[in-house]
Amino acid sequence: MDSSKEPEPTGEFKCQLCGLTAPYTYYGQKPPNTHSIVILEDSYVMKDPFTPDKEKFLILGSLCSLCRRAVCVGAECSLFYTKRFCLPCVNENLQAFPLEIQEDMDKRKPQSKCLTRKKKDSRT
């Protein structure tokens, strides 16, 4: 068999907030073919389709550390502050976050489209 073959997808990642779907090839903190990279959280990862370099990858998302729902890394759906948090959990627990995060969330509110998209799609 040819060892240079592309990795087969392990499954399909789906953000439970915005509905983004993409095939992932690895879940964890140390993606294959990377020598010195360790991700700070267990993440859904895919090989970067825009480069032939096997060491390049894209982080699709991970699980919210509070509610455990799968969320993408998009700013409309989650944030990383020592751990990954979905924006609904951040908003519910906003006072527990540092002032900088609280101020950042205040700036994001008028731009947040994630929850309005969710309401439009009654299938999920």
From Swiss-Prot:
It comes from Gallus gallus. Disulfide bonds: none annotated. InterPro entries: CDPF1 (IPR042426), CDPF1_dom (IPR018785). Residues 115-124 have a biased composition (Basic residues). Residues 105-124 are annotated as: Disordered. Pfam families: C6_DPF. PANTHER family: CYSTEINE-RICH DPF MOTIF DOMAIN-CONTAINING PROTEIN 1, CYSTEINE-RICH PDF MOTIF DOMAIN-CONTAINING PROTEIN 1. This is Cysteine-rich DPF motif domain-containing protein 1. Belongs to the CDPF1 family.
